[in-house]
Amino acid sequence: MSGEENPASKPTPVQDVQGDGRWMSLHHRFVADSKDKEPEVVFIGDSLVQLMHQCEIWRELFSPLHALNFGIGGDGTQHVLWRLENGELEHIRPKIVVVWVGTNNHGHTAEQVTGGIKAIVQLVNERQPQARVVVLDLLPRGQHPNPLREKNQRVNELVRAALAGHPRAHFLDADPGFVHSDGTISHHDMYDYLHLSRLGYAPVCRALHSLLLRLLAQDQGQGAPLLDPAP
């Protein structure tokens, strides 16, 4: 499926429906902030990335890696693609780019969302050939079982298959088991049944941090050959 046929893989800025220009202001700030930085890791995605920056676990685990956080609430894959094409990777040479986006691609099929994520990976590979890409799985959402959970799970299956064997991209299933045996999600983990609480972020961030350290060690010749996390 080409970018012209797939809206999820066509770079598109967010429409400023509220009229305050905040999205574009954040984008310009990210570009400006990156000019004097030498991050080992860059995070890019939606509110799940953005809100991570406000948690103590960010300072504990990711600040020591000189990580940059380019998360914007509400972004879909097409918006991240636009941001990456318009300067957010221009002034830096990270060792790893973490991508967490797709749950906001409303109106797009699982196949289209997968195409958008694959386009992001390809763009990072082209713009930052030295960097590895880590794609986080889309988490379940909603207190009770619902079609969006099923769609996100399908995206995860497709992305995992698409990245299998990719030499510079890795898929991380960071869901520690947010869905309970009765099919519900607790507000202790996701306070609004979408966004993570501090309690919810902890296992996700620790799993991600472990993978990042393994990747960084491997690239420095200090680690054993990396195996992607098991399903």
From Swiss-Prot:
Q: Name one GO biological process term.
A: lipid catabolic process
Question: What is the annotated localization of this protein?
Answer: Cytoplasm
Q: Where is the active site?
A: 47, 192, 195
Annotated keywords: Acetylation, Cytoplasm, Hydrolase, Lipid degradation, Lipid metabolism, Phosphoprotein
Highest rank taxon of the organism = Eukaryota
CDD domains hit by this protein: PAF_acetylesterase_like (cd01820)
Q: Does the keyword Phosphoprotein apply?
A: yes
Q: What is its EC number?
A: 3.1.1.47
Answer whether the UniProt record assigns the keyword Hydrolase to this protein.
yes
> What reactions does this protein catalyze?
a 1-O-alkyl-2-acetyl-sn-glycero-3-phosphocholine + H2O = a 1-O-alkyl-sn-glycero-3-phosphocholine + acetate + H(+); 1-O-hexadecyl-2-acetyl-sn-glycero-3-phosphocholine + H2O = 1-O-hexadecyl-sn-glycero-3-phosphocholine + acetate + H(+); 1-O-hexadecyl-2-acetyl-sn-glycero-3-phosphate + H2O = 1-O-hexadecyl-sn-glycero-3-phosphate + acetate + H(+)
Q: Name one Pfam family in it.
A: Lipase_GDSL_2
**Which GO molecular function annotation, any one, does this entry have?**
protein heterodimerization activity
The record makes one more remark, namely: Originally the subunits of the type I platelet-activating factor (PAF) acetylhydrolase was named alpha (PAFAH1B1), beta (PAFAH1B2) and gamma (PAFAH1B3). Now these subunits have been renamed beta (PAFAH1B1), alpha2 (PAFAH1B2) and alpha1 (PAFAH1B3) respectively.
Q: What does this protein do?
A: Alpha1 catalytic subunit of the cytosolic type I platelet-activating factor (PAF) acetylhydrolase (PAF-AH (I)) heterotetrameric enzyme that catalyzes the hydrolyze of the acetyl group at the sn-2 position of PAF and its analogs and modulates the action of PAF. The activity and substrate specificity of PAF-AH (I) are affected by its subunit composition.
Spell out the PANTHER family in the cross-references.
PLATELET-ACTIVATING FACTOR ACETYLHYDROLASE, PLATELET-ACTIVATING FACTOR ACETYLHYDROLASE IB SUBUNIT ALPHA1
Q: What family does the entry list?
A: Belongs to the 'GDSL' lipolytic enzyme family. Platelet-activating factor acetylhydrolase IB beta/gamma subunits subfamily.
Name of the featured protein: Platelet-activating factor acetylhydrolase IB subunit alpha1
- Its gene name is PAFAH1B3
